[in-house]
């Protein structure tokens, strides 16, 4: 009984999503709708340009900033925040991504220390109006 209590007391505390997500992420795989268009290291990628995709989320003294380099190699900067633990919101993006009004929203499907899976909540004009899913890793 005592051994069980000691073992239970030694569990590693899981950092909040706001801490785990604040890092530089690169694309491991990307889906446009149900179609996988990019897999890191893949030879038959439909959208090989995702090799340059980068989402960098920083939190410095409570100031949350984002830099997003998209599939077309354009970089957008702004702010980010979470709504609960399941929604990532990028705001004040400059220049504003096409049709976004400077705001992009993603569902956080899953997250751990080295991987996050995000689904964009609105269709992307850049990818023919698809809802895209991004599996991102760090490093």
Short names for language-model regions:
Residues 1-12:
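Sec-dependent bacterial lipoprotein signal peptides
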Residues 11-77, 83-139:
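Lipid interaction determinants
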């Amino acid at each position: 009984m005592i051994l069980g209590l000691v073992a239970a007391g030694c569990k590693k505390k899981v950092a909040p999503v706001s801490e785990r997500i604040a890092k530089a992420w690169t694309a491991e795989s990307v889906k446009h709708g149900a179609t996988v268009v990019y897999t890191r290291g893949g030879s038959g990628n439909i959208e090989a340009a995702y090799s340059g995709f980068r989402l960098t989320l920083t939190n410095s003294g409570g100031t949350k900033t984002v830099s997003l380099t998209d599939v077309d190699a354009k970089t957008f900067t702004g702010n980010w925040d979470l709504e609960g633990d399941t929604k990532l919101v990028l705001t004040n993006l400059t220049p504003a991504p096409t049709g976004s009004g400077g705001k992009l929203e993603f569902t956080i499907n899953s997250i751990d220390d080295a991987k996050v899976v995000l689904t964009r909540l609105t269709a992307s004009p850049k990818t023919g109006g698809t809802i895209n899913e991004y599996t991102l890793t760090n490093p």
